[in-house]
Amino acid sequence: VTADPPEVRMNTELLSDQVHRHLRGSIVRGELAPGQRLVESEIARRLGVSQAPVRDAVKRLVHEGLAVYQARRGNYVAEISEEEAAAARRVRAVLEAEAARQALESWSSSAHQLLAADVGAMRAAAAADDAFALREADLAFHRHVVEAGGNAYLLRAWTVLESSFYLLGVIGDPFHLGDLGRTAQWHEDLLELLDAGDVEKAVSEFGRHSASTPAELDR
């Protein structure tokens, strides 16, 4: 019996990294839904690879919080309740408001350039209708705001919670990605507030942005 050809062709280098990126992108785009089982043999067949890199990739997803392992049942795309999402947004709002405040204490042209590059990446992703690339650039933007303040403890807190924030953005509101171009514009507006040096307004807007879902920001 001739095996069916793989549906997706993968390069031969760093297969586990490629499989991880493919699966992560599938979760972001909603192709793998919250609660859906991740069957390693089926994923390996579709991608035309052995199960070993798939197993490694799925373990990384579990570590990141994008998947969960259930004993004797297997691995599943993570689900997040409305209550969990709301709690995470409250924590993120506090952290990001303080990050904006501290970033403005030592704002520099290099910080601006880094965030402007993130906004540019978001605009390019929006033009290509690439939700995965936009999510990655979005998260990088906020991480760079935290880094701009130079507070190692704040950065450590962000690093610990970053995968949860990614999970929130991807799974907390899976059916509303919003207008990708508008998402890029929101971040350009946030960057303009930092450039203007208006501490209270920047703190307020970063907090509001982080506390809201894409659907709420779209209203």
List each model region and its residues.
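Amphipathic alpha-helical dimerization/coiled-coil segments
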Residues: 96-124
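Short linear motifs at protein or domain termini
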Residues: 1-105, 153, 214-219
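Residue-level recognition of alpha-helical structural elements
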Residues: 84, 108-111, 130-134, 150, ...
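Mobile beta-alpha loop/short-helix "lid" or hinge segments that flank ligand
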Residues: 62-68, 159-164, 178-181
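Hydrophobic packing residues in well-ordered alpha-helices of helical domains and bundles
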Residues: 88, 115, 134, 138, ...
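C-terminal all-alpha effector/ligand-binding and dimerization domain
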Residues: 11, 116-123, 128, 163, ...
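Hydrophobic, amphipathic alpha-helical faces that serve as interaction scaffolds
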Residues: 91-107, 139-177
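Amphipathic alpha-helical repeat elements characteristic of tetratricopeptide repeat
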Residues: 17, 93, 109, 113-116, ...
